[in-house]
Design a protein with these regions (language model features):
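N-terminal intrinsically disordered/low-complexity leader segments
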Residues: 1-6, 77, 207-212
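An amphipathic alpha-helix adjacent to DNA-recognition modules
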Residues: 8-13, 47-70, 74-77, 81, ...
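Helix-turn-helix
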Residues: 10, 18-52, 56-60
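Hydrophobic alpha-helical connector segments
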Residues: 71-105, 157
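Amphipathic alpha-helical segments used for helix-helix packing
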Residues: 86-88, 99-128, 171-173
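Short alpha-helical scaffolding segments that buttress acidic/His motifs in well-ordered protein cores
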Residues: 91, 95, 108-115, 160, ...
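C-terminal peripheral helix-coil segments that are non-catalytic and often amphipathic
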Residues: 128-212
Length: 212
């Protein structure tokens, strides 16, 4: 790793940790340069400004996540024998695996904080750069669940994503048992979430009620 690449990576890791603790708006470049052991000129050279740095921190893992999701979806998309569980596996497993990576927990805390604070930068980034990924999954879910209209499908996808976000945070009620390996616990989490999501997505459409 060259000195330039090492410096850039050090800034990104320090920024991720700082944003997880303080949020995007609560973090200053002075704090960042101190944590990364660099000067302000290095941050400006590699990223230009704080907004660009935030984007790079987010995209560093989100690009990887969505590349893996699309690769997994490629294997099952459009096939007559594809099951709902297989498509959910392509959506869920890559996200959980990234959350288990080194630094993944910190990234998830940063992401959860941004969601909780309703950060519009995150919403815009997801829409502009990863909207096509969600549309591909939505199209495949729609193919497998023709009884759902578009609005109902998107509601259910949104709730599945919420459950996935909780699982990625590792902050749920279910903790790893002492006699279960970490790898086995991760697989249990994946399988339980896929079954839960399949039940929620696949059930019949809701009855339409009219007010009297």
């Amino acid at each position: 790793m060259t000195t330039t690449v090492a410096t850039k990576d050090r800034i990104l890791r320090a920024a991720e940790e700082l944003f997880a603790r303080r949020g995007f708006d609560g973090s200053s470049l002075r704090e960042l340069t101190s944590a990364a052991g660099v000067n302000l000129a290095a941050v400006s050279y590699h990223f230009g400004c704080k907004e660009k740095l935030i984007e790079k921190v987010l995209r560093r893992r989100l690009d990887q996540l969505n590349t893996q999701r699309m690769a997994a979806l490629d294997h099952v998309e459009g096939r007559p024998d594809t099951t709902l569980e297989q498509v959910l596996d392509a959506y869920i497993r890559p996200a959980l695996e990234i959350s288990y990576d080194v630094g993944g927990e910190c990234f998830m805390r940063m992401l959860a904080r941004a969601f909780a604070e309703r950060d519009e930068r995150l919403r815009e980034l997801l829409s502009q750069n990863y909207g096509h990924v969600m549309r591909r999954f939505a199209a495949e879910f729609a193919r497998l669940l023709p009884h759902l209209d578009k609005v109902e499908l998107y509601w259910r996808m949104d709730l599945v994503t919420g459950a996935l976000t909780l699982a990625m945070s590792g902050f749920g009620m279910i903790q790893r048992a002492e006699n279960v390996s970490e790898q086995a616990h991760h697989e249990q989490t994946t399988q339980h979430l896929i079954r839960f999501a399949a039940a929620g997505l696949g059930q019949g459409g809701l009855a339409r009620h009219t007010r009297q």
